[in-house]
């Protein structure tokens, strides 16, 4: 059934159980990418699901593991990220404030491969022009 659903859709989101269960193990074996959601204010200890379903996965499981650190709405500058990354072999990580629509939209763009990156170079007066470009892009929701 999962193969049929995947054949008909570009993206399929499977939600694992909050505890290690047969469904959670199946999800961890079947997916192309795993989003590990974690409260950034919690201790960065390995969760039982990570221990049972991810760290013990078969070597052929090629799913990229992405750590999504969830922050309170008022967080300006995330801290303690390295403690999370030191404990788990993830392919990437992203910081998200779930209360902010723009953060959730950014996560959706990243996952759907439609994210936009911005690279600016130069200094002096160009730096002020860069700020203007950045603000204009933000105002347009890019």
Regions found by a protein language model. Give the residues of each.
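Patatin-like phospholipase
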Residues: 1-11, 19-142
């Amino acid at each position: 059934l999962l193969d049929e659903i995947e054949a008909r859709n570009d993206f399929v989101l499977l939600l694992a159980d909050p505890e290690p269960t047969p469904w959670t193990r199946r999800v961890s074996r079947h997916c192309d990418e795993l989003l590990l959601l974690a409260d950034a204010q919690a201790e960065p200890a390995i969760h039982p699901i990570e221990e049972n379903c991810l760290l013990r996965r078969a070597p052929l499981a090629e799913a990229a593991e992405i750590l999504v650190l969830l922050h309170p709405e008022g967080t300006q500058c995330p801290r303690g990220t390295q403690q999370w990354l030191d404990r788990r072999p993830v392919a990437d990580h992203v910081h998200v404030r779930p209360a902010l629509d723009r953060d959730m939209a950014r996560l959706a763009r990243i996952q759907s491969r439609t994210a936009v990156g911005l690279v600016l170079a130069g200094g002096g007066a160009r730096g002020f022009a860069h700020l203007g470009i950045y603000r204009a892009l933000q105002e347009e929701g890019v």
